[in-house]
Amino acid sequence: MFSLPALLIGACAFAAAAVAASGDGCRAGCSLAIAAYYFSEGSNLTFIATIFAIGGGGYQALLPYNPAITNPDYVVTGDRVLVPFPCSCLGLPAAPASTFLAGAIPYPLPLPRGGGDTYDAVAANYADLTTAAWLEATNAYPPGRIPGGDGRVNVTINCSCGDERVSPRYGLFLTYPLWDGETLESVAAQYGFSSPAEMELIRRYNPGMGGVSGKGIVFIPVKDPNGSYHPLKSGGMGNSLSGGAIAGIVIACIAIFIVAIWLIIMFYRWQKFRKATSRPSPEETSHLDDASQAEGIKVERSIEFSYEEIFNATQGFSMEHKIGQGGFGSVYYAELRGEKTAIKKMGMQATQEFLAELKVLTHVHHLNLVRLIGYCVENCLFLVYEFIDNGNLSQHLQRTGYAPLSWATRVQIALDSARGLEYLHEHVVPVYVHRDIKSANILLDKDFRAKIADFGLAKLTEVGSMSQSLSTRVAGTFGYMPPEARYGEVSPKVDVYAFGVVLYELLSAKQAIVRSSESVSESKGLVFLFEEALSAPNPTEALDELIDPSLQGDYPVDSALKIASLAKSCTHEEPGMRPTMRSVVVALMALTANTDLRDMDYHPF
């Protein structure tokens, strides 16, 4: 029944594929890479120099890379501070043969800001340049608690040294985490790459990132402080496996072969036991047995699709069917079993995020929450949702191919979204916190009714009650995150804050972070702009300057002022001073009662 030589060949092939796929297969790193650090409120150059272990002059060493900083004591919030660091060829502790390019920055413990001793707390200081999951994978400490004292954490920040298959001209690269509204193309243009040929080159350095907005890390060639590009070092990069990787393949295939022999023995023993006890065949169990046995996960409420069915429906995941790209995977449109669907495709490394979203969406069912249809766990992880065919709120507000929204439509969208959040916060046990509420995650159907989407991707957290706060990793989108989020504190009031920002977006049609120029150095948050207007001697007049001009004055001024005041309450700096979503729904229902919704039957395109 089983061929041992075939098993050995298969084991070696599997090991080789696993090693080749799990890392870059790098042979060497490069002496220099640059990180684009998002400068947030409370940061300073000394702190940045400390967490990047920059010696020999401290923050002074940062100044040659940041000529725009003329006063080290004053850096505008939202600016990117460029930080040099060495880019090395590293191996994962659990699989040394799996190599990848990253900076390994020694992080002293206890933490400089104090009070944190988890990977979440460490990652929170690096403004999306790394994640808690990445730190856990590249360090030996358990995730629950990192010992203090003289210990240290190696902070791994992905980097690039170039690729000889793309161009020999570039060997110095910027590691740039995208924030809301940014894309690979916009960042590349900011650093001088704007022609079609240059953009094609940048996309080759960043496969799969074209058009992605606000999520993920991109690599951009940059000049050194002398204004010169570093050429790629000859032979410094490549995809051939290192000697360590080859050794790893040999060891892995032997180990897999031994395990295979053990499994064969156990299989025959199990068959005998099965015959004696008349137990059912294991083939009756699904790929998610372990997940379905976990508390609260009820996959029987969703359809399990086959990989073949999804592959055929998307025409082999063709670009014609691709409708989106996120930090954890791609989204495709397809018709499955007569229903229009949106299919999120994730790698196996996103198992935790996949299970989190599956757990939530098999529990919650509401008109204003996107509906999960099914899933698949063959080859990759797939979540299948209902397809919402009128885009998202951000697209309508930015008018990317859409006509302006009427005032009545905006008020109804606000109420729909608030009801979805109220359901999560008030009517589900345990309570769920979305953690990434924003206009891009509010989908609109053909009748302009709103549905909240994007629950997974590690942005969903259970809490025991409305008053309880849970410390976890930082997640969310810049511009929508409340002050407490930077310390990993999560409660339903995090969603309330983000919803307040969405209300400001509905009023102004501006993005959560407003740039007064192409440079990120002149950026202000909507929260700041509206608070400034509401504190003016004549709030109504100041507010009129922020209201979306496409409304052409066709809105009730008193209602606009009430929504702005409600948004201000939602974005209060103190979580305890923010209203509950139930209170927000009541306030918006009162507004809709006074708003003429007859034009909701008219849908401009």
Curated annotation (Swiss-Prot):
GO biological processes: innate immune response; response to chitin
Main location as per UniProt: membrane
Superkingdom of the source species: Eukaryota
Residue ranges of every copy of the Protein kinase domain listed in the record: 317-591
Gene behind this protein: RLK10
Catalytic activity: L-seryl-[protein] + ATP = O-phospho-L-seryl-[protein] + ADP + H(+); L-threonyl-[protein] + ATP = O-phospho-L-threonyl-[protein] + ADP + H(+)
Matching Gene3D superfamilies: Phosphorylase Kinase, domain 1 (3.30.200.20), Transferase(Phosphotransferase) domain 1 (1.10.510.10)
Enzyme class (EC, first level): transferase
The name this protein goes by in its record: LysM domain receptor-like kinase 10
UniProt keyword annotations, A-Z: ATP-binding, Cell membrane, Chitin-binding, Disulfide bond, Glycoprotein, Kinase, Membrane, Nucleotide-binding, Phosphoprotein, Plant defense, Receptor, Serine/threonine-protein kinase, Signal, Transferase, Transmembrane, Transmembrane helix
Entries under InterPro entries matching the protein: CERK1/LYK3-like, Kinase-like_dom_sf, Prot_kinase_dom, Protein_kinase_ATP_BS, Ser-Thr/Tyr_kinase_cat_dom, Ser/Thr_kinase_AS
Residues engaged in binding chitin: 115-121, 142-148
Residues that span the membrane, as ranges: 246-266
